[in-house]
Amino acid sequence: MLLAAGLAAGLAACGAPGGDGGQAANPQAVPDKPSKPVELNILDVAGNLQLTKQMIENFKAAHPEVLSKVTYSTAPAPSMAGKLKAEQDGGVAQTHLVLSGTDGLSAGIANGTLAKVLPDFAGRFPNLMQNYQEPAAKMQELTNGYGVEVVYYPSGPLLEFNPGKVPAAPASPQELLDWAKAHPEKFQYAQPSNSGPGRTFLMGLPYLLGDKDPKDPDKGWDKTWAFLQELGKYVKYYPSGTTETMKNLASGSVDMIMSTTGWDINPRKLGTVPNTVKTAIMQPMHWVTDAQYALIPKGLSPDQESAILQLIAWMLKPDQQAIAYDDGYFYPGPAVKDVTLQMAPQKSQDTIRQFGRPEYEQWIAQYPKETSLPAEQQVKAFDKWNQLVGGSKVGKK
């Protein structure tokens, strides 16, 4: 999607140019409350607003003295770091808050466009790490202080399939490869750098295959790269985003795709995918946890930073976190402890009752949870996938 044009450039012009080495404004220079209500331009590169927009709107309604207006825009994750760099090089910070997955986080850290939030502003988030669920706290550590986790889920990797065409789901990577060979062009996953299910599959395979070092895509993934190259012989193309794989599953152009808990539940709720599809796990199963973050670009004014820090702290309150159950998009969703489905809006409770799968609770409790790759390693993994596996077949039907 194209970015919304003309994002309150007048207000944003008060932001200073970047180039401070990633440091946020001096914490002492950022007031507890802005001197006057601010306007914020929020860029979502992760589909995160589906989970958090109501939290943000609730904050705006409760704190008109902090926030006067919010403008939302969306963009693909791979475009985020370049957009922020162009703004900061031009001395005009038009984007004030980014909602991103680990992909945008990794790219933003790599190109130096994000402000350091922690430990600089730890005082604005009392007991942050203790309040997170344990696997969510590990996902927060991946930020290196350049963001604050707002939602979390165990993710996958899951196989999602049409049971009419796949009577018995593959129970291991070898069985998946055998199935793909026997049914060429009927299995698919999306480009990992722009797809939660795609990168969860990529990062989960080293555990499934018993690779040498699951945290080192460069030197420890020999089995994974060989497997993906072999599997790729039977994949027609790699869509540039997850939604296309869902539509292809629904239309019958493919019969099996990679998925996650949220990408299974939410498209069935929306009707994108028929409610008859099934999911399965491969063994030895390891969840690869996923999260989405609030990222603050460099070059903002102290008032803007003040408002954003208050907003993020608000989003981490348990009553706001309960909104993250949403329609199962990031199931379960809450990053902080002790936020139950019973605390969620009735609509969310109804959705999970109708479209959730009882086995997910059992699987989440039963199998080990591994964090996504750290930022630098994730960028390496995406680059290597583009070179070795699928770069020439992305989006080309």
Report the location of each language-model feature.
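Early extracytoplasmic/lumenal segment of secretory-pathway proteins
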Residues: 27-106
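Extracytoplasmic ligand-binding site segments that recognize negatively charged/polar headgroups
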Residues: 45-54, 77-78, 94, 100-244
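C-terminal capping/gating helix-and-loop segments adjacent to ligand/active sites or protein-protein/ligand interfaces
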Residues: 322-397
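Bacterial signal peptide processing site
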Residues: 15-18
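A bilobed periplasmic-binding-protein/Venus flytrap-type ligand-binding module shared by bacterial periplasmic
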Residues: 158-165, 206-208, 291-304, 323-327
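C-terminal motif of bacterial Sec signal peptides marking the signal peptidase cleavage site
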Residues: 10-13
